């Protein structure tokens, strides 16, 4: 269910409250720093690499100098790998205040390298979007469906009637946890430990044989 972030504040401290709120949102919407940017891909982007630029700080969400625009038609598809696991709690989609703004997003989890044909499979969740040129509307995924996500796919199949879709900002809010490989670490450690344990014995044996 989408909801806005703008609030009415009465009395003193209006500006301070707005600043505090902006700082809080900036911290909450920092999952973009956990994206494996080198392997992030955007299908049907008009300018190569432009899809990566819409994942930026919350306070830069209204920066119109960086955006992604679709090429052949209105579809855009983002394959977003993370450097660990996330629990997705909120999404903001900021586009132009015209018909190029996407009107729907379909979300898939843990399906790397999806294509437009792959997007026909059962979706994990989808939202009807509202024009949001200021980046004030948050869409809240069902956390139970997105509690352990290492790869996220966002598919925008259409817009409000333009030939091309344009997006300025995609914000992701949630929790992040590092990917741990305890089994590998322990095995490597044990292998090194065993070699060290037997090192002296091996050399002792060789020494005795030579003598």
From Swiss-Prot:
One of its GO terms (cellular component) is nucleus. Gene3D superfamilies: PITH domain. InterPro entries: Galactose-bd-like_sf, PITH1-like, PITH_dom, PITH_dom_sf. It comes from the Eukaryota. Signal peptide: none annotated. Residues 20-192 form the PITH domain. Pfam families: PITH (PF06201). Belongs to the PITHD1 family. This is PITH domain-containing protein GA19395. It comes from Drosophila pseudoobscura pseudoobscura.
């Amino acid at each position: 269910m989408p909801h806005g972030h703008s609030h009415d504040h009465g009395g003193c401290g209006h500006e301070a409250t707005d600043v505090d709120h902006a700082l809080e949102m900036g911290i909450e919407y920092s999952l973009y720093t956990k994206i494996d940017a080198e392997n992030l891909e955007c299908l049907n982007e008009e300018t190569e690499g432009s899809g990566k630029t819409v994942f930026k700080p919350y306070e830069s969400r209204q920066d119109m100098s960086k955006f992604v625009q679709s090429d052949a038609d209105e579809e855009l598809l983002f394959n977003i790998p993370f450097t660990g696991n996330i629990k997705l709690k909120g999404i903001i989609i900021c586009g132009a205040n015209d018909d190029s703004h996407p009107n729907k997003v379909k979300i898939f989890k843990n399906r790397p390298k999806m294509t437009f044909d792959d997007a026909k499979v059962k979706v994990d969740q989808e939202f009807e979007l509202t024009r949001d040129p200021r980046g004030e509307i948050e869409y809240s995924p069902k956390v139970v469906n997105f509690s352990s996500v290492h790869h996220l796919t966002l598919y925008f199949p259409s817009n409000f009637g333009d030939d091309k879709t344009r997006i300025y900002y995609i914000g992701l809010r949630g929790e992040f946890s590092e990917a741990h490989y305890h089994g590998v670490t322990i095995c490597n450690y044990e292998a090194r430990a065993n070699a060290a344990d037997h090192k002296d014995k091996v050399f002792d044996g060789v020494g005795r044989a030579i003598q």
